[in-house]
């Protein structure tokens, strides 16, 4: 028979340590956060053998009073909070009072500290799970914590450690994450007595950008858009990569809530949704973002590692993030290297839109608002995408701008233009409908019938008039005027297929945009389709004023620039 018994302190501490101390990087994170909370301006980290042998953290912070040294190594002892209500306003990185106790339970730990204006420092050690009496020790202002032989007394945990090189990479990533949210703090990292990282204090914008560049890379910063967006008590700052810069893995995604690095599914999904219209399948956006919110509206006491948060109103935060990032992404236009100025939080990327007819797929381009000026060398610079020269095999448009040659994918560009116009028309007046001379009868399978019955209102809003015609048939009487009747049956089946596979819990707006993307893809010009110079010119001008005109609805690029210098190098000119 199993009897309930009380665990001794040593066993309880080692079990608790398993929640906080997963690997050497966990130790580094907890100790650096303590240094930051102590207002350290410089933090040095020394690592031996990936942290399994030694982790040494030294800072120049406030230091610890000698009388508090013993308490510092005990569980549930903290200077950050005094009562449960204090959790509503926590602004420090640490507050649980568990880190030092958990670390000392699975290592040989020595803590030395001296406060400002104190005559000397004091040292305390945890030997054989016994906290020794503090003794005087020479030490500069600040605190040094020496952690040796991590998991020496828990062999099961120690054998799960990876190689020293792997463990060190985890430590490096922890320091980089902390360095990205505490720019005024200097960070030094040494491994096996070799300096690996030295982030100097960054008090200027250029200094902060240099630190970001050293961590996320030059290519990220070259494609980065600065964002600063405030609304309804929320503020989002930082940098997001242009839609053309994506990653095969979500490895360059840094999000901070009130200065704390978090991994939050709600935030990650919101940011991905903001990129939805421009993200190629299987690719991931890159960003470093800082969300500021009233501490009373977010709970950071969700998990011992404090990587997870819980918002009081998650939908409010989600909508804000999507709107903020979409607005920033909308600032760039084809051929423009830097974001356009953002005037207000309600910035509308499409302004002064002339109510000209929309493009009709596989028909004449109805883009031309006026006869374009004949091409001359003197006006090339006026248009980022230049002026049309010719068309290649009914697929690509060749254009010349002041930089050199531009090649445009006709279908991809037309698809994006149609998609953005559809969204705008739907939001303003709804999609215009047109009657079919001969209604189309469609036989559907059970899944398709269910999808249509569930989404009748959606089809009506998209400009379709469809009626039931028996248990497994429908009849299409009217369709959006944007679309040609040709292949209308295939289009409706594709839309139904999208709705069948689409998450039924998704919000209506997202579902509508997904269907509009399918409509635009079907309506866009398809190769081979030959255009006149005037039609090509009209397409280029529309691209320049279309939101996300540099990418199609699936995230593929719509155009490519070839600079004269690049061509000269290829043809060995001047060599």
UniProtKB/Swiss-Prot annotation:
Q: Gene Ontology cellular component?
A: mismatch repair complex
Instruction: Show the GO MF annotations.
Output: ATP binding; ATP hydrolysis activity; ATP-dependent DNA damage sensor activity; mismatched DNA binding
An example GO BP is: mismatch repair
Q: Is DNA repair given among the entry's keywords?
A: yes
InterPro entries given for it?
DNA_mismatch_repair_CS, DNA_mismatch_repair_MutL, DNA_mismatch_S5_2-like, HATPase_C_sf, MutL/Mlh/PMS, MutL/Mlh/Pms-like, MutL_C, MutL_C_dimsub
| DNA repair among keywords | yes
Q: Supply the alphabetized keyword list.
A: DNA damage, DNA repair
Checking HAMAP family in the record gives: DNA_mis_repair
Protein role: This protein is involved in the repair of mismatches in DNA. It is required for dam-dependent methyl-directed DNA mismatch repair. May act as a 'molecular matchmaker', a protein that promotes the formation of a stable complex between two or more DNA-binding proteins in an ATP-dependent manner without itself being part of a final effector complex.
What family is reported?
Answer: Belongs to the DNA mismatch repair MutL/HexB family.
**PANTHER family for this protein:** DNA MISMATCH REPAIR PROTEIN MLH, PMS, MUTL, DNA MISMATCH REPAIR PROTEIN MLH1
NCBIfam families according to UniProt? mutl
Query: What protein name applies here?
Result: DNA mismatch repair protein MutL
Q: Which organism is it from?
A: Coxiella burnetii (strain CbuG_Q212) (Coxiella burnetii (strain Q212))
